[in-house]
């Protein structure tokens, strides 16, 4: 867990909280076999970002909504819109993990602290934009 946490500390310049691009961050390691750090941004706490890594890449994931929140009659149209939105959001992509829709981005394991911080900010901004764009498909 320390390797990923150390990179976050370098990226945000603190031990467990800090500010970047006018946003205040807080992060917490999540216990388990896989190294995961939850990153919460002030005033966006309902959309935490989960950061994990493998031998070759880091993945940042932000869960957006649950499958039960999708209006059934609009599901197919929503999926089409999500596919269309992947192109204008080149640093983030839509996905689904179990019954939860998510937006995610990937970085090289060798990414700089600045790159990690930038990805967290971009992913958070894109998550807010995605929820706004998809609101007509959700209960």
Question: In which residue ranges do the predicted regions lie?
Answer:
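Charge-rich, low-complexity N-terminal segments
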Residues: 1-48, 88, 96
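Generic detector of well-ordered alpha-helical segments enriched in charged/polar residues
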Residues: 2-9, 13, 76-83, 131, ...
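Charged, low-complexity, helix/coiled-coil-prone segments
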Residues: 14-29, 57-75
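Hydrophobic residues embedded in beta-strands of well-ordered beta-sheets
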Residues: 34-35, 58, 101-102
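Short N-terminal mixed-charge amphipathic segments
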Residues: 38-65
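Short, internal acidic amphipathic alpha-helical interface segments
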Residues: 59-100
């Amino acid at each position: 867990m320390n390797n990923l946490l150390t990179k976050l500390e370098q990226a945000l310049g603190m031990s467990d909280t800090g500010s970047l691009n006018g946003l205040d961050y807080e992060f917490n390691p999540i216990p388990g076999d896989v190294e995961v750090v939850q990153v919460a941004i002030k005033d966006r706490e309902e959309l935490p970002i989960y950061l994990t890594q493998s031998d070759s890449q880091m993945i940042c994931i932000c869960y957006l909504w649950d499958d039960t929140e999708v209006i059934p009659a609009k599901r197919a149209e929503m999926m089409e819109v999500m596919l269309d939105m992947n192109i204008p959001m080149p640093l983030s992509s839509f996905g689904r993990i179990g019954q939860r829709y998510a937006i995610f981005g990937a970085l090289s394991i060798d990414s700089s602290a600045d790159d990690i911080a930038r990805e967290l900010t971009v992913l958070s901004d894109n998550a807010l934009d995605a929820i706004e764009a998809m609101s007509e498909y959700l209960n």
